Curated annotation (Swiss-Prot):
Assembly, per entry: Homooligomer. Interacts with banf1-a and banf1-b. Interacts with ran-gtp.
Domain of life: Eukaryota
Pfam families: NEMP
Protein name per UniProt: Nuclear envelope integral membrane protein 1
Species of origin: Xenopus tropicalis
Membrane topology: Multi-pass membrane protein
Residue ranges, annotated region (B): 326-395
PTM text: Phosphorylated.
Chain intervals for the UniProt region annotation (BAF-binding site (BBS)): 368-375
Predominant localisation class: nucleus
């Protein structure tokens, strides 16, 4: 009974505590509801300056066109000291921020901006509002709205295009494997550490809640680092280099231990992942929704039509090779062979005479090396390159009825007779 009474007393005390905590909320809500919210309208090209907390809203005045594919609309808040800028969807959200909401309180940390802030506005948002909170009265800040071409969106589109069309090549590249592994290790080292600690902790443990909170804290810290990246690079560059060196080496060692992908299925999964990331980058980089979908569909169809086109081209080449086989060359007759030999010989001799008569020809050096300079001089002047004796010997050897022709003719007959004599001998041996 005592235990039950104590338990009931604890429940009563907790209920009273919660009631006391929630008691001021209705009065606070009634105060904020009665108070009219002041909102300052933002216009393109106009800069406003204040030194106190204000609410600002931008309302879309025109429909996006096809020329706004890579156009950005951004709100820049620049201040002399540290401020807090929170982005919301509309004026109703600004009113809700005046009341205390636990979820909005934590989500505002992920949306808040510090000091020099850039808030990007979606072209299709009818209204975008921000709240600038100033802690000191001597803090001055300016708010400006600008609109124009964003080269970063175009760069993201090109990256998505390359990832989609060259995903297969990148998934098999060792350079891409190691560079991606090192980059992921540098950017997500804290998340990886929390993930490794979660593997070591038991499932039913109070540390699970701590790890879940650690993920949120890690994301928040990464967001703060990217916001203050310029200040970190200028003031703490030694620590930044040390961090990049250590984490980069550990990431490289981890990638080197497991090595690049070798299994074909794993490579295909990586290829498909890169292609999906490429399509996603192409979609988010284009500001006009229907144009973004059209570009994604065109890229997908172009990638898939590559295989049918390749098959059609291979089939066309095979059909062309079968139909258009080159005809065998026609053999020359004896008379054509002699005529062609005479024509080509005369042509070559004329070219040789022309070269010997040119200034580039070293006449004295050539004369010192030949046995009959007079015969060479006669040849250059137009005489025949053969003597009558050489002509008669050539006709005797290679002319009609010469020894060379007789050997060719009668040599074939003798070979046939020898084969006919060998066949009976082989037949007798086999018997």
């Amino acid at each position: 009974m005592a235990g039950e009474v104590e338990g009931e007393g604890c429940r009563v005390s907790w209920g009273v505590l919660v009631a006391l905590l929630l008691l001021p909320l209705p009065s606070l809500c009634s105060l904020t509801a009665g108070k009219q919210l002041q909102v300052i309208k933002l216009f393109e090209g106009r800069v406003v300056r204040y030194n106190e907390s204000k609410n600002f809203c931008y309302q879309r005045t025109y429909e996006p066109k096809w020329s706004d594919v890579w156009t950005k609309i951004q709100i820049r808040v620049n201040s002399t000291k540290m401020i807090r800028v929170t982005q919301v969807e509309n004026e109703e959200k600004l009113k809700e921020m005046e009341t205390f909401n636990m979820f909005d309180f934590f989500s505002s940390f992920l949306k808040e901006k510090l000091n020099d802030s850039f808030i990007y506005v979606d072209l299709y948002n009818n209204k975008t509002c921000i709240k600038v909170h100033v802690s000191d009265t001597d803090t001055y800040y300016s708010v400006a709205l600008s609109r124009g071409f964003d080269p970063r969106l175009f760069f993201v589109f090109l990256c998505g295009l390359l990832l989609f069309f060259y995903g297969d090549t990148l998934s098999r590249s060792q350079i891409f494997y190691y560079s991606t592994g090192i980059t992921v290790g540098m950017l997500a080292s804290m998340l990886i550490l929390v993930f490794m600690l979660s593997k070591l902790m038991p499932k039913k443990s109070p540390f699970v809640a701590l790890l879940l909170g650690g993920w949120s804290v890690s994301i928040y810290v990464i967001q703060l680092v990217f916001k203050n990246l310029q200040a970190i690079c200028t003031e703490y560059w030694q620590y930044l280099l040390g961090y990049l060196g250590i984490v980069g080496f550990v990431s490289f060692a981890f990638c080197y231990k497991y090595g690049p992908l070798e299994n074909e299925r794993s490579i295909n999964i990586l290829n498909w992942t890169l292609q999906l990331i490429g399509l996603l980058l192409m979609y988010i980089s284009v500001q006009i929704r229907h144009i973004a979908v059209t570009m994604v569909v065109i890229a997908f169809c172009t990638k898939q039509i590559e295989y049918p086109v390749r098959w059609i081209y291979i089939l066309y080449r095979k059909i062309k090779l079968k139909r258009g086989k080159p005809s065998p060359p026609r053999l020359l007759t004896e008379e054509e062979y002699r005529k062609q030999g005479d024509v080509e010989t005369r042509k070559a001799l004329e070219e040789l005479r022309g070269y010997c008569s040119s200034p580039d020809f070293a006449a004295w050096k050539t004369v010192s090396r030949i046995q009959s300079p007079k015969r060479f001089a006669d040849f250059v002047e137009g005489s025949s390159h053969l003597t009558p004796n050489e002509v008669s010997v050539h006709e005797h050897e290679y002319g009609f009825g010469g020894s060379f022709l007789e050997d060719e003719l009668f040599g074939e007959d003798s070979d046939v007779e020898e084969e006919m004599e060998i066949e009976p001998v082989l037949y007798q041996d086999l018997r």
